[in-house]
């Protein structure tokens, strides 16, 4: 059993569990053992969905009446890749020259270890005048179907309500406390399949080449910016991710080609208005069908969870900002940049902010965190918890 007030020992214990999504691999069991010793009531619901693996989750709660602070995170990690590329084994938690190495050190077992250690330090001195809960999933790096979104609904059905939430994702950039996330852009993905008619290149009149139409559709999607950004968000961006024709032959006109794209969108749009805009752009392309009624296109939207949001709870943001400044001297930047996170689900239940370790090495070979950063984040979390319940 690691020392509860030592985030390094806690982090090493978690890293030594190879919990690549969707496998628990002992990570939640280790956390359950630690939290139970601290006085938490721990539950381990398992969720499933069609065509997905069952996923274990953890919900732990302590305290009585009053304000309720949720800490949210995940113990699942991305695959380490080629083991021979790592300086140290990715699931051993080796410390060398002031850094702790391991998959999940930054994203985001480090944040969990720091929060637990911070709370343990407080409990050595005083009790919490309120409630603290940890909402931890094993399905954040994967489809995110059997994790936080279902865990929140499960907890709500049991009567849980939260005053605010802190997500321990690695939001800092260069140093602990330089950036906190107060919102996130939405994500929308689609697939455009352009149907043609296969044929010999020497007889184009007998075929229908989908590629020229695909080029026009791509131009319609990308030639005009979606927007110029807003006060809190950078401009929305549409990125083509694949163009697949699957035709290695140089003398064959292909039967079809597929265009996949993703849009990260700001608060100019809702998911519905953005879908309408994309459909309008595609429809602006004139189809020139031959006698076979080809080519033509089909648009399919890929189901997505969560949408763009901004947290406007000034008290929550200020409490966190003041804690950061008092410990580090940094006045954090309020940001909405980057990818999505499980905060997109939590915002439907309570105000949420995100703050954690510097994320330069997340998902990389030799993912690591400095020992100084771990101690600093623990101190900030400790100050934030105390101030939250003051």
Swiss-Prot record:
UniProt GO molecular function: acetylornithine deacetylase activity; cobalt ion binding; succinyl-diaminopimelate desuccinylase activity; zinc ion binding
EC number: 3.5.1.18
Record text on cofactor binding: Binds 2 Zn(2+) or Co(2+) ions per subunit.
Swiss-Prot/TrEMBL GO biological process terms: diaminopimelate biosynthetic process; L-arginine biosynthetic process; lysine biosynthetic process via diaminopimelate
Pathway: Amino-acid biosynthesis; L-lysine biosynthesis via DAP pathway; LL-2,6-diaminopimelate from (S)-tetrahydrodipicolinate (succinylase route): step 3/3
InterPro entries noted in UniProt: ArgE/DapE_CS, Bact_exopeptidase_dim_dom, DapE_proteobac, Peptidase_M20, Peptidase_M20_dimer, Peptidase_M20A
Pfam families recorded: M20_dimer, Peptidase_M20
Active site as annotated: 76, 140 (proton acceptor)
Record's keyword annotation contains Zinc: yes
Residues noted as binding Zn(2+) 1 in the record, renumbered to the chain: 74, 107, 169
Subunit structure, as described in the record: Homodimer.
Record's function text: Catalyzes the hydrolysis of N-succinyl-L,L-diaminopimelic acid (SDAP), forming succinate and LL-2,6-diaminopimelate (DAP), an intermediate involved in the bacterial biosynthesis of lysine and meso-diaminopimelic acid, an essential component of bacterial cell walls.
Homology family: Belongs to the peptidase M20A family. DapE subfamily.
Protein name, UniProt field: Succinyl-diaminopimelate desuccinylase
Species this protein is from: Bartonella quintana (strain Toulouse)
């Amino acid at each position: 059993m690691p020392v509860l007030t030592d985030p390094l020992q806690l982090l090493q214990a978690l890293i030594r569990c190879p919990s690549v999504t969707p496998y628990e691999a002992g990570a939640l069991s280790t956390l359950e053992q630690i939290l139970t010793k601290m006085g938490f009531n721990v539950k381990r619901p398992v969720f499933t969905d069609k065509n997905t693996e069952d996923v274990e989750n953890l919900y732990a709660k302590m305290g009585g009446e009053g304000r309720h602070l949720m800490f949210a995170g995940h113990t699942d990690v991305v695959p380490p890749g080629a083991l021979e590329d790592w300086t140290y084994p990715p699931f051993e938690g080796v410390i060398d020259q002031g850094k702790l190495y391991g998959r999940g050190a930054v994203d985001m077992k480090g944040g969990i270890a720091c929060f637990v250690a911070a709370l343990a330090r407080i409990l050595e001195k005083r009790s919490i005048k309120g409630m603290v809960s940890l909402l931890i999933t094993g399905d954040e790096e994967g489809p995110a179907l059997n994790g936080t979104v279902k865990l929140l609904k499960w907890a709500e059905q049991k009567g849980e309500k939260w005053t605010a939430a802190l997500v321990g994702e690695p939001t800092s950039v260069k140093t602990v406390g330089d950036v906190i996330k107060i919102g996130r852009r939405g994500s929308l993905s689609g697939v455009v399949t352009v149907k043609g008619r296969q044929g010999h290149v020497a007889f184009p009149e007998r075929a229908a080449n989908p590629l020229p139409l695909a080029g026009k559709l791509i131009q319609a999607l990308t030639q005009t910016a979606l927007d110029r950004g807003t006060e809190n968000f950078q401009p929305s961006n549409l990125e083509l991710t694949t163009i697949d024709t699957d035709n290695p032959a140089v003398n064959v006109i292909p039967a079809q080609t597929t265009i996949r794209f993703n849009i990260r969108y700001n608060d100019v749009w809702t998911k519905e208005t953005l879908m309408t805009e994309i459909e309008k752009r595609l429809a602006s392309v004139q189809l020139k069908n031959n006698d076979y009624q080809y080519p033509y296109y089909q648009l399919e939207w890929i189901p997505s969870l969560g949408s763009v949001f901004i947290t406007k709870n000034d008290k929550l943001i200020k409490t966190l900002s003041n804690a950061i400044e008092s410990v580090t001297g940094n006045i954090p930047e309020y940001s909405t940049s980057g990818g999505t996170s499980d905060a997109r689900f939590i915002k439907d239940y309570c105000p949420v902010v995100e703050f954690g370790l510097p994320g330069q090495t997340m998902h990389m070979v030799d993912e690591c965190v400095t020992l100084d950063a771990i101690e600093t984040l623990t101190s900030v979390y400790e100050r934030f918890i105390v101030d939250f319940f003051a």
